[in-house]
Amino acid sequence: MLLLEGNDMWVNLKTSFVDIDELLLFLKGQKFSGYLHFEFSDSQCALFLQLGDVVNGLVALEEERNVGSRAVKRILVRSRQDKGGTIKVTQLPLQNMQFLSEAYGLSVRMLHKNLSSKYSNLSEFLEKLQYESFSGCIEVWFPVDDRHGIIFLEDGLTTAIMTEELLVDLKEGTASQLKFAESFINRAQRSGVQYNAFVEN
């Protein structure tokens, strides 16, 4: 699961020790903007907060990504019951959290796994998805430097691209945004990336 890097306030908190309700109440009082990243034995999850309020949740299983209020409820129940999980609390600027929460707006399931740009050209694959009015995301892995990225699509159009360092909103389609998208895709193709395609549920 890919999230933006930020200011890690707490790391490796144990769900066996931390009361998630008390933690969220404290963060609400602080008008905290950022996310809580949970790691469990079979999944990774995140709660997205803006000014102390939980606005979205993400449950990442091997072949699906679930978001929204049901994901939030699932995460809260799991963190109360599963004593083997860990939590990281990361602070981000409010605008970054607004972008991040919006980017993870669709629940998706895996459609194609372990594709390689060496054998399946990424640009041509994206053109095919555009023709099909595809909604979902492409998770990209750069094997050379072990970095990750995500290309978000709605109705065939690329709406955002995210790496660990930045999230670029492409909805306005300005010249600089389109140039960034083209540069990212070209770099991914040259780097021989591996990628998975997830389609909207």
What are these language model-derived features?
Residues 1-201:
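Acidic, Ser/Thr/Pro-enriched low-complexity segments and adjacent helix/loop capping patches
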